[in-house]
C-alpha cells in the first residue's frame, strides 16, 4: 500500500507539479475530475450520478493545500485522505463532495458540522450555505482551524472547541448537519437540532468494523428515516456518546 501511494504521488507530482503549472490550479482541476469520476462510479450506491454545479464550483475554488501540513502541500490534491496531526485526517475530496451533495445545501442554509479538523470541509460548505457552525473536540486543531478560516476571510463560518455529540443548541435549528467522524449511533441531540425537512450525513460504525455513510432525513412530522449510502472509513467520534 505504501509503495502504491509513493508511485501515485510521484506520477501526480510529475504531471501536475505546481512548478510546472504555476500554483496548484492544474492539480486542483485534476482532483475535481477524479472526484467526478468517483461520483459516476459509485452512483448505484449513492444515488448521485453527478454533482450539482454549486458543489463542483466549491471544490474547484477551495484551495486544499492551505488545509494540510506544509510538508504535504505538494500532494494536497490527490484524491485521498491525508494526516493533519493528532490522529486526525482531512477527508478524501470525493467524500467531501459526496457528503456535501447528499445534504442538498442551498444558499442561505444554516449548516452544522461536527469535526472541524483542518477546516476544509467547513469552507466547502461555506461556499454554498449562508452560515456554517463547526465544532472540534481537539483543542489545538479547533484553534488552528479557526485562525485559518479567519485569515482566509470566511466570515460566514463560526467555530468552537467542544463536544460535537451535543451539537450547538443555541444556534439551532439547522437545515443540514454533517458529522465527519464515525459514531455508533445517530446522536439524539443532533436529531433534535435538525429542522423538519432537514438532512444529516453521518458515518456509522466502529473503528475496527465496517462503517457506512448514512443519510438521515427528518420529516415534517418529526419522524426520522435512514438510508445507507456506501461503505466508508472515518476516525471515531469522541465525546459524550
What does each model-found stretch correspond to?
Residues 8-16:
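Bacterial N-terminal signal peptides
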Residues 102-223:
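Conserved nucleotide-cofactor-binding alpha/beta core module
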Residues 1-7:
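Bacterial N-terminal signal peptides that target proteins for export
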Residues 20-112, 128, 143, 151, ...:
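Class I SAM-dependent transferase core
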Amino acid at each position: 500500500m505504501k509503495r502504491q501511494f509513493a508511485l501515485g504521488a510521484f506520477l501526480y507530482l510529475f504531471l501536475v507539479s505546481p512548478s510546472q503549472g504555476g500554483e496548484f490550479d492544474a492539480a486542483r482541476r485534476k482532483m475535481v475530475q477524479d472526484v467526478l469520476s468517483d461520483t459516476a462510479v459509485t452512483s448505484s450506491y449513492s444515488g448521485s450520478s453527478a454533482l450539482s454545479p454549486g458543489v463542483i464550483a466549491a471544490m474547484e475554488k477551495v484551495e486544499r493545500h492551505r488545509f494540510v501540513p506544509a510538508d504535504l502541500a505538494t500532494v494536497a490534491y490527490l484524491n485521498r485522505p491525508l494526516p493533519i496531526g493528532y490522529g486526525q485526517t482531512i477527508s478524501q475530496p470525493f467524500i467531501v463532495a459526496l457528503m456535501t451533495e447528499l445534504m442538498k445545501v442551498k444558499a442561505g442554509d444554516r449548516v452544522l458540522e461536527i469535526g472541524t479538523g483542518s477546516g476544509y470541509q467547513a469552507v466547502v460548505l461555506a461556499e454554498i450555505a449562508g452560515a456554517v457552525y463547526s465544532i472540534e473536540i481537539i483543542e489545538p486543531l479547533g484553534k488552528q482551524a479557526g485562525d485559518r478560516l479567519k485569515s482566509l476571510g470566511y466570515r460566514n463560518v463560526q467555530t468552537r472547541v467542544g463536544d460535537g455529540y451535543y451539537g450547538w443548541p443555541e444556534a439551532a435549528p439547522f437545515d443540514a448537519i454533517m458529522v465527519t467522524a464515525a459514531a455508533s449511533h445517530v446522536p439524539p441531540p443532533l436529531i433534535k437540532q435538525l429542522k423538519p425537512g432537514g438532512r444529516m450525513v453521518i458515518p456509522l460504525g466502529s473503528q475496527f468494523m465496517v462503517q457506512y455513510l448514512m443519510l438521515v432525513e427528518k420529516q415534517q412530522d418529526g419522524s426520522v428515516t435512514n438510508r445507507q449510502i456506501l461503505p466508508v472509513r472515518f476516525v471515531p467520534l469522541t465525546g459524550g456518546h
